[in-house]
Amino acid sequence: LECREAKKGFHIILDESAFYPEGGGQPSDAGYLNDVKVKEVHEKDGEIIHYTKEAIEAGSDVTGKIDWDRRFDLMQQHSGEHIVSGLVHEAYGYDNVGFHMSSDVITVDLSGVLSEAQLAEIEAETNRKIWENSEVEITYPSRDELDKLDYRSKKELTGQVRLVRFPGSDLCACCGTHVTHTGEIGAVKILTVENFHEGIRLTMICGKRVMDYLNMVNDQNRQVSMKLSAKIGETAAAVARLQDENFRLKGQVNHMFDELCTVEAKNWEGAGSVLLFHEGLEADQVRRMADAVMQKCSGCCAVFSANGDGSHDIFYCIEKGMKADTVVAVEKLLQDHTEMELVNDF
């Protein structure tokens, strides 16, 4: 055992460790050495470094305890990603060119583009492979054996190679942690897909994260269902109806506001420069009101509107070629009014 003081805690080096160090897109294990919390683990220059906030006496014996919930979650994510990547490679020849696991999702970068229908089939086939509950095989082939195998690898490998086989879906060089049987993954769900370089980036979840996501989506959908008085399976149609109604009502409001602008403009016809106060107008309505009145008042027009949050919207229009002193006068008038205490019935 060795304990080195660092800038933000201590680096603990053991003669043996069951903690997985960060690498290959997979975060490190966390846990405890005796009662000292291990925040993260990294490999550097052949050493496994355990990052802690407290020191441990050098040369003492320690008992490590891995955060199993975290480890098993990462095993589920990593194993699920292997099956997806293997099936994509087998069906379309695309490579996994980037992989990252975070605390909520994993991302997989593929070298080619797949349609939604193709991804749906990959997802379905992945879950079929999971439910077969096949044993995951981990081997350490010799160099001669390795040369005869067709396996996935992102880079040229030297030294001893560790192969992870998911029967019927993937054979890949990998140093990460994995489940012992595919059934332990539980399920895989592809959440989103976006264009990325020459291919696509998948965002997906596996295992318990799928259940957590399903519970969240179900709770959200149930609340929407109650608010819209719609059945659970019909909320999308209910939202579409609500959007149509909202669009229709917005059209009516816009028409009524145009009529209001016409009346307001007529009231100030030929009046010269005009300053108006209207409460609660949206920014676009402030602009439309100023533009309408300016067309009739033979001067420039400024509209000032107070919002419910204490902020204000202001817009003023001037005619092309209007003298600068007129504009200055309007700005002075605006300044004088904004310095006054405003009341709700202005």
Predicted region positions:
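Conserved nucleotide-binding/hydrolysis modules and their immediate coupling elements
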Residues: 1-60
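Short, hydrophobic/aliphatic alpha-helical segments
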Residues: 3-18, 59-71, 157-171, 322-341
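A generic structural motif
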Residues: 11-12, 45-54, 106-112, 314-315, ...
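Active/ligand-binding-proximal structured segments within catalytic/core domains
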Residues: 17-33, 57-108, 341-345
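Short amphipathic alpha-helix segments
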Residues: 29-32, 79-89, 176, 284-295, ...
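A common structural junction motif
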Residues: 66, 124-134, 297, 332-341
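Functional cores that coordinate and move charged inorganic groups
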Residues: 70, 90-196
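Terminal appendage regions of diverse proteins
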Residues: 191-346
